[in-house]
Amino acid sequence: MALNPDRLFSAEPGTREIARRLFASVEKLPIISPHGHTEPIWYARNEAFPDPASLFVKPDHYITRMLYSQGHSLESLGIASRDGRPSETDARKIWRLFATNWYLFRATPSRLWFEHAMETVFGITERLSQENADRIFDAIADQLTQPHMRPRALYDRFNIEAISTTDAATDPLIYHDEVIASGWHGRIIPAYRPDAAVDAGRPDFASEVEKLVGVAGTPLTWQGYLDAHRNRREYFKRRGATSSDHGHPTAQTADLSAGDASRLFDRVIKGNASTSDAEMFRAQMLTEMARMSIDDGLVMQIHPGSFRNHNPTVFERFGLDKGADIPRQTGFVDQLKPLLDGFGNDPRLTVILFTLDETAYSRELAPLAGDYPALKLGPAWWFFDSPEGILRYRKLTTETAGFYNTVGFNDDTRAYLSIPARHDMARRVDCAYLAGLVADHRLEEDEAYEVAHDLAYRLAKQTYKL
């Protein structure tokens, strides 16, 4: 299982040698992690991770969804159900189930990330199997008790320069405050994620809005609601936030008059919003958030196009983020036009667009980012954060948008130990792509070195204002 130093490089010797040289120049660069889902409490409390299953299996929906698809219950993986049904609590049993089914992950990015962590973090080069499951479990568990495996030590070991968490608009950010108060040098910053108080299609929307205005101390009116967002965005900024994040079902935007927007708010705040009103409210709020970003400087990320909770059985029994979200077709040209008509040429605005619809890369996203100064393309996301997905992304966007209308790499992960693995993968794939351009005489090698550095480090740091 030992990691091959030429993994993800071309099999053609000349191109592979170019990729080796390029990768050597970026391999040790610091990690900028501008968007992700690690827990701020890890850095605040700096406690040991409890066991291998809690570290690698239970929080990783890439892992749990694959096992679930093969007939293994989520309870058997230690996932707690909403109805109180018993779930497995023995970490060793969960690990054995994972190890016995390790073959399911052949050729997946999960295998790349896991084996990178095994070797580079724990020094384990055996391929996981039913036969060695207990031995590897014990080896990992022993190391997890040691000081060098605490979250802050790993932050330094991974050469992380900054990491952003993703946090609800009403989050008090107490763990971010604890990190700051501790005097530790690590840069752990929040990102403003207001979806719960913006998505009028959610059953808890009205209560989330009441919570938002309550925390902000503003009235429950359209203007009070907008002021509450401004208040909370400033609260996040004081704790280092540089971005907001918006996970909407579509990329639809709108630009209603103040009167129409106020009347729409009055309808949806009563609860049970119609489908059309919920969509229009989300659309208007993307435009309002863009307007706020011009005022306060937060970079705006839009992550549209996921059919959330597609499997109602999983959602009803286990809740959100259990691997049952599915990509759907997503349009951008017509949907973003109201926002772009108002703000697309404003140099104070940066909107980073992501997609789960790869067909939109060359048809819509690259042409849009190649024209509007306010737009940038986010990296390959979620299901396409993989060697083939990143390569397709480069091939489909570079000719129209270039490299400098993209923003480098996001690891976008809940799995802390996969952060260096994901950045290693992205740097290797980008270097392999650049090596091909050099070999084809479409790029000079000195230019490729510069682009490789920008993709690995500078673009993320610059775009996210880090």
From Swiss-Prot:
The gene is uxaC. Pathway: Carbohydrate metabolism; pentose and glucuronate interconversion. InterPro entries: Metal_Hydrolase, Uronate_isomerase. This is Uronate isomerase. GO terms for biological process: D-galacturonate catabolic process; D-glucuronate catabolic process. It comes from Brucella suis (strain ATCC 23445 / NCTC 10510). NCBIfam families: PRK02925.1. Belongs to the metallo-dependent hydrolases superfamily. Uronate isomerase family. Pfam families: UxaC (PF02614). GO terms for molecular function: glucuronate isomerase activity. Keywords: Isomerase. It catalyses: D-glucuronate = D-fructuronate; aldehydo-D-galacturonate = keto-D-tagaturonate. Its EC number is 5.3.1.12. It comes from the Bacteria.
